[in-house]
Amino acid sequence: MADGSRLPESATSTTMETNTNEHAKVLSPDAETVPSSSMTATSSELSLDGRWGERDQGEPVSRRGAMEDFEEMRRELTQLSLRRTRSVGKDAHRLRSRASGRASQVHDEEKAIDEEDSTIDGDGDGYQGGFDLGEFLMGGHLERRTTTGEPAKKVGVLFKHLTVKGVETGASFVRTLPDAVVGTFGPDLYRIVCSFIPQLRFGKQPPVRELLHDFTGLVREGEMMLVLGRPGAGCSTFLKTIANDRGAFAGVEGEVRYGGLSAEEQLKHFRGEVNYNPEDDQHFPSLTVWQTLKFSLINKTKKHDKNSIPIIIDALLKMFGITHTKNTLVGNEYVRGVSGGERKRVSIAETLATKSSVVCWDNSTRGLDASTALDYAKSLRIMTDVSKRTTFVTLYQAGESIYELMDKVLVIDSGRMLYQGPANKAREYFVNLGFHCPEKSTTADFLTSICDPNARQFQPGREASTPKTPEELEAVFRNSETYKTICDEVASYEKKLQDTDQEDTRRFQKTVAQSKSRTVSKKSSYTVSFARQVLACVQREFWLLWGDKTSLYTKYFIIISNALIVSSLFYGESLDTSGAFSRGGALFFSILFLGWLQLTELMPAVTGRGIVARHKEYAFYRPSAVSIARVVMDFPAIFCMVVPFTIIMYFMTGLDVTASKFFIYFLFVYTTTFSITSLYRMFAALSPTIDDAVRFSGIALNILVIFVGYVIPKQGLIDGSIWFGWLFYVNPIAYSYEAVLTNEFSDRIMDCAPSQLVPQGPGVDPRYQGCALPGSELGRRGVSGSRYLEESFQFTRSHLWRNFGVVIAFTVLYLIVTVLAAEFLSFVGGGGGALVFKRSKRAKKLATQTTQGNDEEKVQDVGDKAALSRGEAMSASNGESFKRISSSDRIFTWSNVEYTVPYGNGTRKLLNGVNGYAKPGVMIALMGASGAGKTTLLNTLAQRQKMGVVTGDFLVDGRPLGADFQRGTGFCEQMDLHDNTSTIREALEFSALLRQDRNVSKQEKLDYVDQIIDLLELNDIQDAIIGSLNVEQKKRVTIGVELAAKPSLLLFLDEPTSGLDSQAAFSIVRFLKKLSLAGQAILCTIHQPSSMLIQQFDMILALNPGGNTFYFGPVGHDGGDVIKYFADRGVVCPPSKNVAEFILETAAKATTTKDGKKIDWNEEWRNSEQNQRVLDEIQQIREERSKIPVTETGSPYEFAASTMTQTLLLTKRIFRQYWRDPSYYYGKLFVSVIIGIFNGFTFWMLGNSIANMQDRMFSIFLIIMIPPVVLNSIVPKFYINRALWEAREYPSRIYGWFAFCTANIVCEIPMAIVSSLIYWLLWYYPVGFPTDSSTAGYVFLMSMLFFLFMSSWGQWICAFAPSFTVISNVLPFFFVMCNLFNGIVRPYRDYPVFWKYWMYYVNPVTWWLRGVISSIFPTVQIDCSPSETTHFNPPPGQTCANYAGNFITNIAKNGYLLNPDASADCQYCPYSNGAEYMATLNVHDGDKWRCFGIFLAFVIINWLLVYFFIYTVRVRGWSFGMGYLFGGMGLVIDKVKGVFKRKSEKA
């Protein structure tokens, strides 16, 4: 693009036309074609015709193609409009008349796109006569134009004297476990309350500082402004301020106007018209592209125009070249879906569907390769031109082609405006100030370098006179002609608004008002009514449910399998009195299980907040609409869950087969599940994080279970639990339990079971027997179910429908709280933050010198001060340090490398015959298009592949790789994988101590770490926590960790510049170059190399998709060697073209020679002279190096450090991790305290009645409530540590599997002891258990073992399971089996044969319960209350003792008579002491130490399973046949689905 082709913005009417026509030149394929003497497709053309995502699918982003698609959509909408017009002809006629009148009066100065539209269509009359969209266009549809063709919504953005202030947070210290514990008692609560009610803050207010200083400027409609600056300069702050997203700032001064609208008016009435799009693509992964766009349009299209939605979606898909992804899941990093580039386009299309007028895009090219980034920018240009939007963009690495698409540029440094004006004049402006622009530097890189003291260059002789500081550069700019022009533009724009009486603004307001549904207030920011918002969200909830079929099918599998297992436990339940209590247990499980399973609803409720918040800003819907929609969706979803569960449970457990009773049972299971789900969602809405939501929900459910009336009868709760008895009345499950229990037992007369008849034996007259069941009547062998419930639980059937109403009322209450919380609470952070340090003298000293503003980027002054030196000069001492990094002269070669993986029913080759070598002092750039196999080759060379087949020769000095190869190489992951709670120094020391040779002393290793910290210039922030670092600092730490290992052979780096701004990327590559010059061999993948970056590399290894090499050789001066290779084959690189982009685009496109022959670049390389030279070089290296005698340069061990050293250092690190991440340990303490208090004080000082014995049993049993909550914290922590070990630390041979297992196990022990002690103290003594040391000590030991069992249980499950999904599915199964098959809920004697002789005994909880019960119960003497005794009359003339003595002594052998001398109404107590009571539980006196030993064995087995599964599954790769199992299940499911699909097609 010629510099003179773009004029500075002015108030003239020709400016926009000039700019738009210029963009047509840039974007049009016709303008892009450059003739070539040898090729039919030139590199210039290639550079502007890239694709997003997969190279073999997507479509090129073409502005002309997009405009044609847009016109096709308009024609289709015309037909739609015409059909509608026939029915409302008169209205349309009036509308056309008004439009015609306006057209004669109003002159639109921005017709460029309309002119091009008519050129494309070629039929001017087509729009005059046929395109009668009248009402449709005035309703605010996509193009937002009037009937005359002018934009209906034109909103320029004007900002005057804009100053933004943020709170100075300062460098903070890491929060540790003691801080969390102390915070519980007030400080944390105070901070939370003050965050919602700032007026409650007292004391000195935190200081504020300016984030942006006095910005003035204008961006007209249809213009794009590029905002440039280093991370932390204030770019995101500026964009958020323009987007009116000001919640994170302390204050905003000055004026921002949108046309004639103030910021306040825009926020209140037009929020969705100004949008901010963050750099991350946040979408629901299980929605398809079509569904994502349809949902957006549903909420932005009034009902009258709903038929236009499919037409607009098709146009958007065509416009952005993603039609082929229409029915593909959007996906994310965990769910497979569209590619990253395609997901970017979905974000753009969604934003276009919002029909907003101003859009701010924040660094949205992060992670994209150069070609994809260009296509992204072209798409923004399309969006801006087609819909006349006002667009702001920040980009960290912008190529020249991207820069040329922009109208204006704004350069920011430290919140100061260094330049604002025409993009094509920015370079000239700074050159005139005295700065030097390197020949190969892009304009964007040059402008960004102005903000970096170490990167900018001055013209010779002007170093002193050129302004340098942000303040000086700002002052110079304010005195420049460019700034005066801006001020004139602003004044002219304001004058135009006044002269036209703000006609555009009024038209904008009218258009927005007419775009709303009739039932929506014209002052509302939303387009459709709240009811339609809810309906749209309901539709999306259904899509989400159906889109994630794996989770859906898994949930049904869990429901059905658990229903079968549990109902089989109660199968064949006797209908007489012996089955009464067990029947109550089955009913209790029925109303509880599905609610418990619904804990999975917490995850989508919390993780979807970011999307909901963004959609609120887009004015799609109110957040409360989502909450209500989820409830609406629960009706059918829960119904489908309850149907199979209730049918299985009801009929297999032998409940009363009466239609009315079954449907009442079904109703209460359904409503209870609904209520519990609503309760979970309420906690999710009130919780900042998913950990908090799980913790609170789990504890709440446990408390509800205690106070349901099953564990302790209703009267016992109310009278006996003096602190918490009231919880029964606020417990919806209690009302449901009363309902289902009375429903089952009412109108039922139970025959007394022979075993419960008192007395029994020879000579006993049946007329003089009683039944040992509460509710039995004197002289009757049958027991009324209603009377039984009244006596045992104080339940009555007359409360049935009252209880139903109460459950509904609680559900509504939870829903109301959820809706209010969703509407008024927001836990979505604004990003950014200060450095966090560990507490040390060095860090404290630094913290007093450092302050930090609350900018949106991670603005870290300390980090900037400690930045890598980007100047050319280097001290002699640093030079010596670099020379000491690598002293190895070994050469690594690879030849004919191929890598094949299973794919479908066959295989796929990802690498194909790759050859190469890495010499000391040589830096190789590994390049290729997306999917070419760069990372695959890097992992293969580093010997990190875990699946598939690798073939080829990998040699070091001509010899096979040794056991220490991986230890001798460094591998820098792209994702910067670290323990985020470690400091920089700790991470480097950990790497050095474990990876350097074991013969090197510890002091030498630590001294070496000091050198690395000096080289990386991390001294000032060496005590900073890694998790608080910015992107560049983390990259430096990643490199430092690998250098600290002192790799003796090779350093691999995977995308070390990804996500960095251009200057940070250059500094990283410059640093690598210095390492290379010092003798280090480096192989590095890179995907957005500028010309300056690529010059730092010595060689390029370039791959095409399929892992085919198409170039391996030197770069040459200014890329001369690469250019010559392609020029010799007829492809000439333009002088200004980036060499890296040139070779990638050339190889990716099918090119032909003059004679029409297509060039296969892969084959061209294989047959080239250069390839033969590479093969000869590899052979020569092998022959020469293999003759050199082998010298022992280090230990031959696989791991440098001993297993003991590995274990000790890793244990120390994990302890430190738990200490600095207090939520983990704190969560365990919190659960122990809460459950301990509720357990202990609910069963306060139990007496000696039978009911109290049952209370003792359940008090002991309630420890099983802790595992579901605790395991949900253990599993994620272990999983994260395991992922880090598998991804980086084991492949680098830092430490082995034994050390990993041992350290994780050991670190759980202290907290298990502490939390078990807390639980034991809060539970044991308040209940009134024996206080003698032997019993109390034994129970404490068992409690401690149980907590150790929990941690090891979660660890071995996590060690085996491949993913969180599998873990979440496995855990409920284990919980059900352990909680039910232990002899408490259903007595052992009543077990079905199938379970009786194995499940009971392999259940660890069985032995824990038996051990504790056998320790506590024997010493208790039972005193029955009269209501607990069995009543019977002796025959006339006999006393109770005479009549029942033989029964008590010889048959029952238990119990005693309360009135042995009475001759009527004998009262028999079935137990005289605890030993007799526990015998009914299959527990015997003297079992305790046997049970202790067996339970200890289970704990040890758990630990051994951790070692076993980590070694077999993670190290050896065993699957235990699970792959075949799941593969077979998948085939079966596919066949079944195929059958149904064929049937539906036939139908």
Swiss-Prot record:
CDD domains: ABCG_PDR_domain1, ABCG_PDR_domain2. This is ABC multidrug transporter atrF. Glycans are attached at residues 299, 363, 905, 980, 999. Residues 197-439, 892-1130 form the ABC transporter domain. The keyword Cell membrane applies. It is found in: Cell membrane. Pleiotropic ABC efflux transporter involved in the basal level of azole susceptibility. Confers resistance to fluconazole and voriconazole. Induction: Expression is induced upon voriconazole treatment. Expression is increased in clinical azole-resistant isolates. Expression is down-regulated by tetrandrine and posaconazole in a synergistic manner. Its main location: membrane. Residues 111-123 have a biased composition (Acidic residues). Residues 1-66, 85-123 are annotated as: Disordered.
